[in-house]
């Protein structure tokens, strides 16, 4: 379906599965290879707790009106891993993790959106993102 341009959203682990490889449990595992890059465990910083749980403001990487409307918000996160993209043009948004590392939290290409946060737990802005994404792309 993805190769036919049908829109989709990968949420949290779903986003991570879109990449080439992941290292959950320290074992290199193949992903769906729809985005170039891999998934790494969050680094241990003094100010950081793993898993990263709670609300964080996104920082947009693209200045497009659609993404400004839908990703320029705070969203709810529960994760221990982060996506490291090879192609930075696919990056939509980041958050600043532990005041030390900007990590990718939204990626996009060919009508496929990946988000590290949980839009279904992110109140109105998360539900609007899901609803409007499919209305816009269908």
Identify the residue ranges that each predicted region occupies:
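Amide-donor transfer/coupling interface in amidating biosynthetic enzymes
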Residues: 3, 37-138
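Cysteine-nucleophile active-site neighborhood
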Residues: 1-52
């Amino acid at each position: 379906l993805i190769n036919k341009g049908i829109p989709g959203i990968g949420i949290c682990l779903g986003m991570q599965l879109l990449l080439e490889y992941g290292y959950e449990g320290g074992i290199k595992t193949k992903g769906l290879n729809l985005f170039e890059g891999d998934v790494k465990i969050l680094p241990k910083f003094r100010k950081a707790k793993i898993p990263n749980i709670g609300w964080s403001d996104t920082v947009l990487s693209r200045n497009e009106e659609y993404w400004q409307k839908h990703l320029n918000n705070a969203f709810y996160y529960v994760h221990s891993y982060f996506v490291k993209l090879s192609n930075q043009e696919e990056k939509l948004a980041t958050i600043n993790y532990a005041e030390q590392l900007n990590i990718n939290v939204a990626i996009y290409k060919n009508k496929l959106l990946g988000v590290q946060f949980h839009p279904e737990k992110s109140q109105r802005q998360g539900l609007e993102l899901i609803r409007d994404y499919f209305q816009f792309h269908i």
